[in-house]
Amino acid sequence: AGARSYFSLKNAISDLLEFDYFFPTHQGRAAENLLFSAIVKEGDILPGNSRFDTTKAHIEYRKATALDCTIDEAKDTQLEIPFKGNIDLEKLENALKSYPKEKIPAVVLTVTNNTAGGQPVSMENIRETSRLCQKFDVLLLIDSARFAENAYFIKTREKGYSDKSIREIVREMFSYADVMTMSSKKDAVVNMGGFLAMKSEALWKKCKIYCILNEGFITYGGMSGRDMEALAQGLEEGTDFDYLESRIKQVEYLGSRLDEFGIPYQRPAGGHAIFLDAKKIISRVPAEEFIAQTLAIELYLEAGIRTVEIGALLADRDPVTRQNRFPELELLRLAIPRRTYTNNHMDVVAVAVKNVFDRRNNIRRGYEIVSEEPIMRHFTVELKPL
Protein backbone atom coordinates (compact mmCIF):
# COMPACT_ATOMS: atom_id res chain seq x y z
CA ALA A 1 0.00 0.00 0.00
CA GLY A 2 2.99 2.32 0.08
CA ALA A 3 4.91 1.38 -3.06
CA ARG A 4 7.16 4.10 -4.45
CA SER A 5 5.68 3.33 -7.87
CA TYR A 6 2.45 4.98 -6.67
CA PHE A 7 4.35 8.26 -6.45
CA SER A 8 5.95 7.68 -9.85
CA LEU A 9 2.46 7.37 -11.31
CA LYS A 10 1.13 10.32 -9.32
CA ASN A 11 3.95 12.51 -10.61
CA ALA A 12 3.46 11.34 -14.21
CA ILE A 13 -0.26 12.16 -14.09
CA SER A 14 0.39 15.52 -12.45
CA ASP A 15 3.18 16.50 -14.86
CA LEU A 16 1.56 15.39 -18.11
CA LEU A 17 -2.17 15.73 -17.45
CA GLU A 18 -2.16 18.28 -14.59
CA PHE A 19 -4.65 16.47 -12.38
CA ASP A 20 -3.88 16.70 -8.65
CA TYR A 21 -6.04 13.81 -7.43
CA PHE A 22 -6.27 10.26 -8.75
CA PHE A 23 -7.00 6.61 -8.02
CA PRO A 24 -5.12 3.74 -9.67
CA THR A 25 -7.50 1.07 -10.96
CA HIS A 26 -6.95 -2.32 -12.53
CA GLN A 27 -8.72 -1.27 -15.78
CA GLY A 28 -10.52 1.65 -17.33
CA ARG A 29 -13.95 0.20 -16.63
CA ALA A 30 -13.05 0.12 -12.94
CA ALA A 31 -12.32 3.85 -13.09
CA GLU A 32 -15.78 4.35 -14.59
CA ASN A 33 -17.30 2.24 -11.83
CA LEU A 34 -15.70 4.35 -9.08
CA LEU A 35 -16.83 7.62 -10.61
CA PHE A 36 -20.33 6.58 -11.61
CA SER A 37 -20.91 4.94 -8.21
CA ALA A 38 -20.31 8.35 -6.70
CA ILE A 39 -22.16 10.65 -9.11
CA VAL A 40 -24.75 8.74 -11.22
CA LYS A 41 -28.23 7.84 -9.97
CA GLU A 42 -31.38 6.38 -11.50
CA GLY A 43 -33.02 8.69 -14.04
CA ASP A 44 -29.89 10.73 -14.77
CA ILE A 45 -28.91 11.85 -18.28
CA LEU A 46 -25.29 11.87 -19.43
CA PRO A 47 -24.94 13.60 -22.83
CA GLY A 48 -21.76 13.42 -24.88
CA ASN A 49 -20.34 11.92 -28.03
CA SER A 50 -20.60 8.15 -28.59
CA ARG A 51 -19.90 6.04 -25.50
CA PHE A 52 -18.14 2.70 -25.90
CA ASP A 53 -19.49 -0.50 -24.38
CA THR A 54 -18.37 -0.44 -20.74
CA THR A 55 -19.07 3.27 -20.30
CA LYS A 56 -22.59 2.93 -21.66
CA ALA A 57 -23.17 -0.24 -19.64
CA HIS A 58 -22.08 1.40 -16.38
CA ILE A 59 -24.53 4.23 -17.07
CA GLU A 60 -27.44 1.98 -18.02
CA TYR A 61 -26.74 -0.46 -15.18
CA ARG A 62 -27.57 2.46 -12.87
CA LYS A 63 -30.81 3.07 -14.81
CA ALA A 64 -29.47 6.30 -16.27
CA THR A 65 -29.30 7.29 -19.96
CA ALA A 66 -26.29 7.86 -22.21
CA LEU A 67 -27.43 10.52 -24.70
CA ASP A 68 -25.43 10.48 -27.95
CA CYS A 69 -24.78 13.97 -29.32
CA THR A 70 -22.15 13.04 -31.93
CA ILE A 71 -22.21 15.09 -35.13
CA ASP A 72 -24.43 13.62 -37.87
CA GLU A 73 -21.52 13.58 -40.33
CA ALA A 74 -20.06 10.61 -38.44
CA LYS A 75 -22.86 8.44 -39.83
CA ASP A 76 -21.61 8.84 -43.42
CA THR A 77 -18.63 6.50 -43.61
CA GLN A 78 -17.47 7.83 -46.98
CA LEU A 79 -17.40 11.48 -45.93
CA GLU A 80 -13.85 12.68 -45.21
CA ILE A 81 -13.68 15.41 -42.58
CA PRO A 82 -10.85 15.81 -40.07
CA PHE A 83 -12.77 15.58 -36.77
CA LYS A 84 -15.63 13.15 -37.18
CA GLY A 85 -15.70 12.35 -33.45
CA ASN A 86 -16.90 15.81 -32.41
CA ILE A 87 -19.89 16.54 -30.23
CA ASP A 88 -22.68 18.44 -31.99
CA LEU A 89 -22.66 21.54 -29.79
CA GLU A 90 -26.24 22.48 -30.66
CA LYS A 91 -27.47 19.02 -29.64
CA LEU A 92 -25.46 19.25 -26.44
CA GLU A 93 -26.78 22.68 -25.52
CA ASN A 94 -30.35 21.56 -26.19
CA ALA A 95 -29.81 18.58 -23.88
CA LEU A 96 -28.34 20.78 -21.16
CA LYS A 97 -31.33 23.13 -21.49
CA SER A 98 -33.88 20.30 -21.53
CA TYR A 99 -33.00 18.68 -18.20
CA PRO A 100 -32.46 20.15 -14.74
CA LYS A 101 -28.85 20.38 -13.62
CA GLU A 102 -29.51 17.80 -10.89
CA LYS A 103 -30.27 15.22 -13.61
CA ILE A 104 -26.97 15.72 -15.49
CA PRO A 105 -24.01 14.56 -13.40
CA ALA A 106 -21.53 14.97 -16.27
CA VAL A 107 -21.00 15.44 -19.98
CA VAL A 108 -18.88 12.55 -21.29
CA LEU A 109 -16.43 13.29 -24.10
CA THR A 110 -14.62 10.24 -25.51
CA VAL A 111 -11.28 10.84 -27.26
CA THR A 112 -10.90 9.41 -29.75
CA ASN A 113 -14.51 8.46 -30.54
CA ASN A 114 -14.15 4.67 -30.75
CA THR A 115 -17.77 3.84 -31.56
CA ALA A 116 -17.76 6.25 -34.51
CA GLY A 117 -14.63 4.67 -35.96
CA GLY A 118 -11.67 5.87 -33.89
CA GLN A 119 -12.41 9.42 -35.02
CA PRO A 120 -10.76 12.37 -33.25
CA VAL A 121 -12.26 15.35 -31.46
CA SER A 122 -10.87 18.80 -32.28
CA MET A 123 -9.43 21.14 -29.66
CA GLU A 124 -12.03 23.72 -30.64
CA ASN A 125 -14.77 21.17 -29.94
CA ILE A 126 -13.25 20.25 -26.57
CA ARG A 127 -12.98 23.94 -25.68
CA GLU A 128 -16.57 24.74 -26.68
CA THR A 129 -17.88 21.64 -24.90
CA SER A 130 -16.10 22.84 -21.76
CA ARG A 131 -17.61 26.31 -22.19
CA LEU A 132 -21.11 24.83 -22.29
CA CYS A 133 -20.38 22.68 -19.23
CA GLN A 134 -19.24 25.76 -17.32
CA LYS A 135 -22.29 27.71 -18.47
CA PHE A 136 -24.63 25.02 -17.15
CA ASP A 137 -22.43 24.10 -14.15
CA VAL A 138 -21.94 20.47 -15.21
CA LEU A 139 -18.78 18.36 -14.92
CA LEU A 140 -16.84 17.58 -18.09
CA LEU A 141 -15.55 14.01 -18.04
CA ILE A 142 -13.04 12.98 -20.71
CA ASP A 143 -12.88 9.25 -21.42
CA SER A 144 -9.22 9.30 -22.31
CA ALA A 145 -8.18 5.84 -23.50
CA ARG A 146 -6.78 7.21 -26.77
CA PHE A 147 -5.96 10.77 -25.74
CA ALA A 148 -2.48 10.70 -27.28
CA GLU A 149 -3.78 9.61 -30.68
CA ASN A 150 -6.34 12.40 -30.42
CA ALA A 151 -3.54 14.88 -29.69
CA TYR A 152 -1.65 13.61 -32.76
CA PHE A 153 -4.66 14.35 -34.97
CA ILE A 154 -5.02 17.82 -33.47
CA LYS A 155 -1.36 18.49 -34.25
CA THR A 156 -1.59 17.22 -37.82
CA ARG A 157 -5.10 18.40 -38.76
CA GLU A 158 -6.12 21.45 -36.72
CA LYS A 159 -5.01 24.98 -37.55
CA GLY A 160 -2.67 26.51 -35.01
CA TYR A 161 -1.29 23.29 -33.53
CA SER A 162 1.31 22.04 -36.01
CA ASP A 163 4.16 23.68 -34.08
CA LYS A 164 3.01 22.45 -30.67
CA SER A 165 4.34 19.26 -29.11
CA ILE A 166 2.06 16.32 -28.33
CA ARG A 167 2.50 16.95 -24.61
CA GLU A 168 1.59 20.64 -24.96
CA ILE A 169 -1.56 19.64 -26.83
CA VAL A 170 -2.40 17.00 -24.22
CA ARG A 171 -2.08 19.56 -21.42
CA GLU A 172 -4.42 21.94 -23.21
CA MET A 173 -6.95 19.16 -23.88
CA PHE A 174 -7.14 18.26 -20.20
CA SER A 175 -7.12 21.87 -19.04
CA TYR A 176 -10.75 21.92 -20.16
CA ALA A 177 -11.75 18.78 -18.21
CA ASP A 178 -12.87 18.35 -14.61
CA VAL A 179 -12.33 14.61 -14.45
CA MET A 180 -10.89 11.84 -16.63
CA THR A 181 -11.02 8.07 -16.83
CA MET A 182 -8.19 6.11 -18.41
CA SER A 183 -7.96 2.60 -19.78
CA SER A 184 -4.19 2.34 -19.86
CA LYS A 185 -3.98 -0.67 -22.15
CA LYS A 186 -4.48 1.79 -24.98
CA ASP A 187 -2.39 4.96 -25.15
CA ALA A 188 -0.28 4.22 -22.07
CA VAL A 189 1.10 1.15 -23.88
CA VAL A 190 0.77 -1.29 -20.95
CA ASN A 191 -0.96 -4.64 -20.57
CA MET A 192 -2.93 -3.82 -17.42
CA GLY A 193 -4.19 -0.84 -15.50
CA GLY A 194 -6.12 2.38 -15.53
CA PHE A 195 -6.90 5.37 -13.37
CA LEU A 196 -9.49 7.95 -12.41
CA ALA A 197 -8.18 11.51 -12.05
CA MET A 198 -9.86 14.75 -11.07
CA LYS A 199 -9.15 18.35 -10.11
CA SER A 200 -11.61 18.49 -7.21
CA GLU A 201 -10.57 17.20 -3.80
CA ALA A 202 -14.25 17.00 -2.83
CA LEU A 203 -14.99 14.64 -5.74
CA TRP A 204 -11.88 12.59 -4.88
CA LYS A 205 -13.15 12.16 -1.32
CA LYS A 206 -16.57 11.17 -2.64
CA CYS A 207 -15.03 8.40 -4.78
CA LYS A 208 -12.53 7.18 -2.16
CA ILE A 209 -14.72 4.60 -0.46
CA TYR A 210 -15.65 3.02 -3.81
CA CYS A 211 -11.96 2.52 -4.59
CA ILE A 212 -11.39 0.75 -1.28
CA LEU A 213 -14.59 -1.28 -1.67
CA ASN A 214 -14.07 -2.39 -5.27
CA GLU A 215 -10.39 -2.06 -6.18
CA GLY A 216 -8.12 -1.92 -3.16
CA PHE A 217 -6.46 0.73 -1.07
CA ILE A 218 -6.20 4.18 -2.64
CA THR A 219 -2.44 3.90 -3.28
CA TYR A 220 -2.66 0.81 -5.48
CA GLY A 221 -6.29 0.31 -6.53
CA GLY A 222 -5.88 -3.27 -7.72
CA MET A 223 -2.52 -2.67 -9.42
CA SER A 224 0.86 -4.11 -8.53
CA GLY A 225 3.84 -1.82 -8.04
CA ARG A 226 5.28 -3.12 -11.29
CA ASP A 227 2.12 -2.19 -13.20
CA MET A 228 2.01 1.32 -11.75
CA GLU A 229 5.66 1.88 -12.67
CA ALA A 230 5.03 0.60 -16.20
CA LEU A 231 2.01 2.88 -16.53
CA ALA A 232 4.03 5.92 -15.47
CA GLN A 233 6.62 5.07 -18.12
CA GLY A 234 3.90 4.32 -20.68
CA LEU A 235 2.41 7.80 -20.34
CA GLU A 236 5.82 9.16 -21.31
CA GLU A 237 6.42 6.81 -24.24
CA GLY A 238 2.83 6.94 -25.48
CA THR A 239 3.01 10.70 -26.02
CA ASP A 240 6.15 10.56 -28.17
CA PHE A 241 5.41 12.00 -31.62
CA ASP A 242 7.56 9.56 -33.59
CA TYR A 243 5.93 6.58 -31.88
CA LEU A 244 2.44 7.95 -32.56
CA GLU A 245 3.24 8.72 -36.17
CA SER A 246 4.59 5.23 -36.87
CA ARG A 247 1.49 3.69 -35.30
CA ILE A 248 -1.06 5.86 -37.07
CA LYS A 249 0.75 5.54 -40.40
CA GLN A 250 0.39 1.77 -40.12
CA VAL A 251 -3.38 2.17 -39.73
CA GLU A 252 -3.35 4.45 -42.78
CA TYR A 253 -1.34 1.86 -44.68
CA LEU A 254 -3.99 -0.79 -44.06
CA GLY A 255 -6.61 1.69 -45.23
CA SER A 256 -4.65 2.35 -48.42
CA ARG A 257 -4.51 -1.37 -49.19
CA LEU A 258 -8.27 -1.66 -48.70
CA ASP A 259 -8.70 1.35 -51.01
CA GLU A 260 -6.90 -0.61 -53.73
CA PHE A 261 -9.58 -3.30 -53.45
CA GLY A 262 -12.50 -0.87 -53.25
CA ILE A 263 -13.49 -1.95 -49.75
CA PRO A 264 -15.56 0.63 -47.81
CA TYR A 265 -14.57 1.69 -44.29
CA GLN A 266 -15.12 4.66 -41.99
CA ARG A 267 -13.09 7.45 -43.55
CA PRO A 268 -10.65 8.90 -42.81
CA ALA A 269 -8.69 6.06 -41.19
CA GLY A 270 -8.93 6.14 -37.40
CA GLY A 271 -6.13 6.34 -34.92
CA HIS A 272 -6.06 2.76 -33.70
CA ALA A 273 -8.08 0.76 -36.21
CA ILE A 274 -9.79 0.51 -39.55
CA PHE A 275 -13.57 0.20 -39.18
CA LEU A 276 -15.10 -1.70 -42.10
CA ASP A 277 -18.58 -0.59 -43.19
CA ALA A 278 -20.27 -3.96 -42.82
CA LYS A 279 -23.62 -2.73 -44.17
CA LYS A 280 -21.98 -1.84 -47.45
CA ILE A 281 -19.92 -5.03 -47.65
CA ILE A 282 -22.55 -7.69 -46.87
CA SER A 283 -25.70 -5.75 -47.64
CA ARG A 284 -27.90 -8.83 -48.09
CA VAL A 285 -27.76 -9.88 -44.43
CA PRO A 286 -30.84 -8.61 -42.50
CA ALA A 287 -30.17 -6.20 -39.63
CA GLU A 288 -31.74 -8.56 -37.09
CA GLU A 289 -29.16 -11.21 -38.04
CA PHE A 290 -26.22 -9.06 -36.86
CA ILE A 291 -24.49 -7.77 -39.98
CA ALA A 292 -21.13 -6.74 -38.52
CA GLN A 293 -20.89 -9.85 -36.36
CA THR A 294 -21.52 -11.97 -39.44
CA LEU A 295 -18.64 -10.21 -41.19
CA ALA A 296 -16.42 -10.77 -38.13
CA ILE A 297 -17.08 -14.50 -38.28
CA GLU A 298 -16.50 -14.65 -42.03
CA LEU A 299 -13.12 -12.94 -41.66
CA TYR A 300 -12.13 -15.26 -38.82
CA LEU A 301 -13.05 -18.32 -40.87
CA GLU A 302 -11.18 -16.89 -43.87
CA ALA A 303 -7.85 -16.18 -42.21
CA GLY A 304 -8.04 -16.47 -38.42
CA ILE A 305 -8.18 -12.69 -38.04
CA ARG A 306 -9.93 -11.68 -34.84
CA THR A 307 -11.92 -8.45 -34.99
CA VAL A 308 -14.65 -6.69 -33.00
CA GLU A 309 -18.20 -5.95 -34.09
CA ILE A 310 -19.47 -2.44 -33.40
CA GLY A 311 -23.07 -2.88 -34.40
CA ALA A 312 -26.36 -4.31 -33.19
CA LEU A 313 -24.81 -6.99 -30.99
CA LEU A 314 -22.68 -4.50 -29.08
CA ALA A 315 -25.54 -1.98 -29.02
CA ASP A 316 -27.38 -4.45 -26.76
CA ARG A 317 -31.07 -4.34 -25.92
CA ASP A 318 -33.00 -1.29 -24.83
CA PRO A 319 -32.94 -1.48 -21.00
CA VAL A 320 -36.66 -0.66 -20.79
CA THR A 321 -38.29 -2.42 -23.78
CA ARG A 322 -35.67 -5.22 -24.04
CA GLN A 323 -35.84 -4.92 -27.82
CA ASN A 324 -32.67 -5.07 -29.89
CA ARG A 325 -31.21 -1.67 -30.72
CA PHE A 326 -30.11 -1.22 -34.33
CA PRO A 327 -27.50 1.53 -34.75
CA GLU A 328 -27.21 3.44 -38.00
CA LEU A 329 -23.68 2.14 -38.46
CA GLU A 330 -22.65 -1.51 -38.53
CA LEU A 331 -18.87 -1.40 -38.24
CA LEU A 332 -16.21 -4.07 -37.93
CA ARG A 333 -13.14 -2.89 -36.05
CA LEU A 334 -9.72 -4.06 -37.21
CA ALA A 335 -7.73 -2.77 -34.22
CA ILE A 336 -3.96 -2.93 -34.64
CA PRO A 337 -1.87 -3.90 -31.59
CA ARG A 338 0.91 -1.49 -30.69
CA ARG A 339 4.52 -2.33 -31.54
CA THR A 340 3.58 -5.78 -32.79
CA TYR A 341 2.96 -6.14 -36.52
CA THR A 342 4.74 -5.10 -39.71
CA ASN A 343 3.13 -3.81 -42.89
CA ASN A 344 3.53 -7.32 -44.30
CA HIS A 345 0.99 -8.42 -41.72
CA MET A 346 -1.30 -5.61 -42.88
CA ASP A 347 -1.01 -6.99 -46.42
CA VAL A 348 -2.23 -10.37 -45.19
CA VAL A 349 -5.18 -8.74 -43.42
CA ALA A 350 -6.09 -6.68 -46.49
CA VAL A 351 -6.06 -9.70 -48.80
CA ALA A 352 -8.19 -11.68 -46.35
CA VAL A 353 -10.76 -8.87 -46.26
CA LYS A 354 -10.68 -8.78 -50.07
CA ASN A 355 -11.37 -12.52 -50.24
CA VAL A 356 -14.47 -12.09 -48.09
CA PHE A 357 -15.45 -8.99 -50.08
CA ASP A 358 -15.20 -10.93 -53.35
CA ARG A 359 -17.78 -13.46 -52.16
CA ARG A 360 -20.02 -10.92 -50.43
CA ASN A 361 -23.01 -11.63 -52.66
CA ASN A 362 -23.05 -15.22 -51.41
CA ILE A 363 -23.34 -14.12 -47.77
CA ARG A 364 -27.10 -13.77 -47.34
CA ARG A 365 -27.81 -14.96 -43.82
CA GLY A 366 -26.35 -14.12 -40.44
CA TYR A 367 -26.76 -15.46 -36.92
CA GLU A 368 -29.30 -15.69 -34.14
CA ILE A 369 -28.70 -15.56 -30.41
CA VAL A 370 -28.81 -18.83 -28.47
CA SER A 371 -28.04 -17.32 -25.06
CA GLU A 372 -27.07 -13.88 -23.79
CA GLU A 373 -26.51 -11.91 -20.61
CA PRO A 374 -28.88 -9.05 -19.74
CA ILE A 375 -26.10 -6.48 -20.15
CA MET A 376 -22.86 -6.35 -22.20
CA ARG A 377 -23.98 -9.49 -23.99
CA HIS A 378 -21.39 -9.26 -26.78
CA PHE A 379 -18.60 -10.51 -24.51
CA THR A 380 -20.15 -13.93 -23.82
CA VAL A 381 -23.06 -14.32 -26.25
CA GLU A 382 -23.65 -17.68 -27.95
CA LEU A 383 -24.78 -17.59 -31.58
CA LYS A 384 -25.84 -20.07 -34.20
CA PRO A 385 -25.82 -19.63 -37.98
CA LEU A 386 -29.05 -19.23 -39.93
Where are these regions (language model features)?
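Flexible, glycine/charged-enriched surface loops at secondary-structure junctions
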Residues: I218-G225, L244-R247, G262-A269, I310, ...
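A structural motif shared across PLP-dependent enzymes of the aminotransferase-like
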Residues: A1-S8, R317-P319
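PLP-dependent enzyme catalytic core of the Aspartate aminotransferase-like
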Residues: G238, E302, L314-L386
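Conserved PLP-enzyme active-site core in the AAT-like
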Residues: R4-I263, P286
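Active-site loop ensemble at the mouth of alpha/beta enzyme cores that anchors a bound cofactor
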Residues: K279-R306, V320-P327
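Conserved glycine-rich beta-strand-loop-beta hairpin in the small C-terminal domain of fold type I
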Residues: Q250-E252, Q266-A278
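N-terminal "arm"/small-domain region of PLP-dependent enzymes with the aminotransferase-like
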Residues: A1-A3, A12, A335-R339
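Short, conserved charged micro-motifs
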Residues: K205, S283-I291, R339-V348
